[in-house]
A protein has these predicted regions:
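Hydrophobic N-terminal alpha-helices or hydrophobic patches in metabolic proteins across all domains
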Residues: 1-307
């Protein structure tokens, strides 16, 4: 039995003649826009209702992703995405009832979500940027593996996972390179990794491997500090984003090396890739983000007051 909200989205997409993924992206965009209205135009009478709709839409968008994480057996993200909808609804109701008494931390969080979603949406929706992030991630990881003497690897030609069609080489894709005019499959643009002799490694690089999600959390948190001068915010961004990228390259290299060298390893039914990618690397990333936040609190004490 299909989940009711996913079924409703499917019915809407069928009536519009577009893919489910496109409707979900429209929900995300609408949520970001209405939250942005609530953040940047919060003195207007309609701002609380706009924010309430935005929280609900963003919660619904994340909730609709939970089915995918159930399929790939990622319990951490299942819990986080499934809980987003009730939390979003609760925040929307609270916004309407307590708009004039809303603490500055909630106002900041509203802007944080907006300015985290906007850059991710742009990167995802502009194929050239999307492919650029994927290529940079794969190339940097390959270079680190080679430099550290952990093996001889090479990048295979970039592939495109088309929604409902399958995977084809990028050279055969005739889609628009500047505007995403068609939905992509689960992997989107991706680069398989190979050994130097051409044998395939069971790891590919997709947009999610670029740590873009981690970067946009800090982008949103820093940009939303509207009371802080831009020069201080830019300095914090220049420190946070390159650091996240470098740490992510080490993370990816570790996952590749462990997966490639411990093929038969299992722990409670999990293979090496599933264990490192879904558990070890996630908890390691959360710890690294925690340390990053502590460092940023020294640069931006205002950020600490909102968290």
């Amino acid at each position: 039995m299909q989940e009711p909200l996913a079924l409703l989205v499917g019915m809407i997409s069928d009536s519009l003649g577009i893919a489910d993924a496109s409707v979900q992206l429209m929900i995300c965009a609408l949520g970001a826009i209405t939250l942005g209205v609530g953040f940047h135009l919060r003195s207007e009478w309609y701002a609380p209702y706009s924010s309430a709709f935005g929280w609900t839409a963003m919660g619904l968008f994340l909730y609709l992703q939970s089915a995918h994480y159930v399929e790939i057996s990622d319990p951490v993200l299942v819990v986080m995405t499934a809980g987003a909808l009730p939390i979003g609804i609760a925040m929307g109701v609270w916004e309407i009832r307590n708009w004039n008494e809303a603490p500055e931390a909630l106002v900041w969080f509203r802007g944080c979500v907006v300015w985290a979603v906007v850059p991710y949406y742009l990167v995802y929706s502009i194929p050239m940027l999307n492919m650029g992030f994927v290529y940079a991630t794969a190339w940097n990881t390959e270079m680190l593996l080679e430099f550290a003497g952990l093996g001889s690897y090479q990048m295979a030609p970039m592939m495109v996972d088309l929604y409902g069609t399958g995977e084809i080489p990028l050279s055969e894709w005739d889609g628009n390179r500047w505007i995403m005019s068609e939905p992509l499959g689960e992997n989107g643009f991706f680069i398989p990794l190979e050994h130097a002799d051409g044998t395939v490694v069971s790891v590919s690089f997709i947009l999610a491997c670029s740590a873009l999600q981690s970067m946009i959390v800090f982008v949103g948190a820093i940009v939303a500090l509207s009371s802080v001068p831009w020069n201080r915010r830019m300095r914090a961004l220049f420190i946070a984003l390159p650091t996240i990228h470098v740490l992510n390259v080490f993370r990816n290299a570790g996952i590749v090396w462990l997966t490639d060298n411990y093929v038969g390893w299992t722990f409670m039914g999990l293979g090496m890739f599933d264990f490192t990618h879904s558990y070890a690397a996630k908890f390691g990333s959360l710890f690294a983000m925690f340390l990053m936040a502590l460092a940023l609190f020294d640069l931006l004490p205002e950020l600490h007051r909102h968290i």
